[in-house]
């Protein structure tokens, strides 16, 4: 039920005309709460008249299935310490646990927990293997 609500809300937000003005950034994962911020360029940072930012924030902060939201966003391990190991199946409909650090799930559905090797592209949701760092936030390379 929580997944259906999540998909419905994401579709509603994506179809909103104000959504094109939103730059949505995941700021931090902290315990079981996902903290997000929404902003518009050249705006006074006040809330949107159509309630879009409130809807997005509510989706992330008050989701009934935080483990699923965490896993779908980043594949990071859950606060209780349980996670999916290297090359193990992961994704929506497979498990509500995330991949062990620094791995991420290769696909939202029926993926495998992997990390990005040296010299390969990395970024916000594609983490480098242990001992490597990504030199860019979105279009970096593991070094």
Swiss-Prot record:
Keyword presence, Signal: yes
Biological-process GO terms, alphabetical: defense response
Entry comment describing in which tissues the protein is expressed: Expressed in trichomes, that are stiff epidermal hairs located on the surface of petioles and leaves.
Primary localization class, coarse: secreted
GO molecular function: sodium channel regulator activity; toxin activity
Subcellular location(s) per record: Secreted
Residue stretch(es) of the prosequence: 19-80
Cellular component, GO annotation: extracellular region
Keyword field contains Thylakoid: no
Signal peptide segment: 1-18
Disulfides per UniProt: 83-100, 90-105, 99-113, 115-129, 122-134, 128-142
Keywords: Disulfide bond, Ion channel impairing toxin, Knottin, Neurotoxin, Plant defense, Secreted, Signal, Toxin, Voltage-gated sodium channel impairing toxin
Cited function: Plant defense neurotoxin that causes pain and systemic symptoms in mammals via modulation of voltage-gated sodium channels (Nav). Potent modulator of human Nav1.5/SCN5A (EC(50)=55 nM), Nav1.6/SCN8A (EC(50)=0.86 nM), and Nav1.7/SCN9A (EC(50)=208 nM), where it shifts the activation threshold to more negative potentials and delays fast inactivation. Also shifts the voltage-dependence of steady-state fast inactivation of Nav1.6/SCN8A, but not that of Nav1.5/SCN5A or Nav1.7/SCN9A. On Nav1.7/SCN9A, principally acts by binding to extracellular loops of domain IV (Nav site 3).
Domain statement: The presence of 'disulfide through disulfide knots' structurally defines this protein as a knottin. This toxin contains 2 'disulfide through disulfide knots'.
Family membership: Belongs to the urticatoxin-2 family.
Protein name per UniProt: Beta/delta-urticatoxin-Uf2b
Organism for this UniProt entry: Urtica ferox
């Amino acid at each position: 039920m929580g997944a259906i609500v999540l998909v419905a809300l994401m579709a509603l937000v994506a179809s909103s005309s104000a959504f094109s003005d939103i730059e949505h950034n995941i700021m931090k994962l902290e315990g079981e709460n996902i903290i997000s911020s929404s902003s518009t360029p050249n705006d006074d940072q006040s809330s949107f008249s159509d309630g879009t930012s409130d809807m997005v924030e509510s989706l992330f902060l008050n989701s009934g299935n935080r483990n699923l939201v965490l896993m779908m966003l980043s594949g990071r391990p859950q606060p209780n310490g349980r996670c999916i190991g290297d090359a193990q199946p992961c994704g929506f409909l497979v498990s509500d646990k995330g991949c062990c650090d620094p791995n991420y799930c290769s696909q939202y559905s029926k993926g495998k927990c992997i990390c990005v090797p040296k010299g390969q592209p990395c970024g916000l949701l594609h983490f480098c293997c242990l001992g490597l760092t990504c030199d860019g936030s979105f279009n970096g390379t593991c070094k």
